[in-house]
Design a protein with these regions (language model features):
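Noncatalytic carbohydrate-binding groove/subsite architecture in carbohydrate-active enzymes
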Residues: 1-46
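Aromatic-rich peripheral "rim/lid" segments of glycoside hydrolase catalytic domains that contact
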Residues: 41-160
Length: 160
């Protein structure tokens, strides 16, 4: 599908791949869990926490819309000091001097995902991501054959 990596930004690639009959097992789509996931917050500044929460909203909106993905499993509920400085949890370090186990903005995003509160809770993330509609985060994924056809069309257009 023309990409060396699968990220939340191009998650449609994985969705299209898993729904390709060539990847099926006994004629059925394989189960696909995104496990041990969560965006990181660099630190506990408000900007970093909002960025993490917006990243989580982005990821969850993708998962929600892509039918090939069966589940999203958060990496950890709390930041863990033994993970090399990563802060991928939905709550702060247990020994944080200001707010031990404090709920990060990402906690509220995860809590309200797929509930009637989702739209309201996720609204802040659009500004952070620089979009006006969640539709803007989705991309059409072309398989290799489609990409080759586009290249041929583009090459022909050069001569026309």
């Amino acid at each position: 599908f023309g990409t060396p990596y699968v990220t939340f930004k191009n998650l449609e690639v994985l969705d299209k791949w898993i729904k390709n009959p060539d990847t099926f097992y006994n004629g059925q789509k394989r189960t696909l869990f995104l496990s041990e996931q969560n965006p990181n917050s660099l630190d506990y500044t408000e900007a970093a926490l909002q960025e993490q929460a917006a990243g989580l909203a982005f990821a969850l909106k993708k998962v929600e819309a892509l039918s090939g993905i069966d589940a999203y499993i958060a990496h950890s509920w709390i930041d863990a000091p033994y993970e090399g400085g990563l802060k991928t949890g939905l709550r702060k370090y247990p020994d944080d001097p200001v707010d031990p186990y404090g709920r990060k903005p990402a906690w509220f995003v995860f809590r309200d995902w797929e509930t009637p509160q989702e739209d309201e809770t996720f609204e802040f993330a659009k500004k952070q991501i620089d979009i006006t509609s969640w539709d803007q985060i989705f991309h059409d994924v072309k398989d290799e054959e489609q990409q080759n056809e586009i290249k041929k069309e583009n090459a022909l257009n050069v001569y026309i």
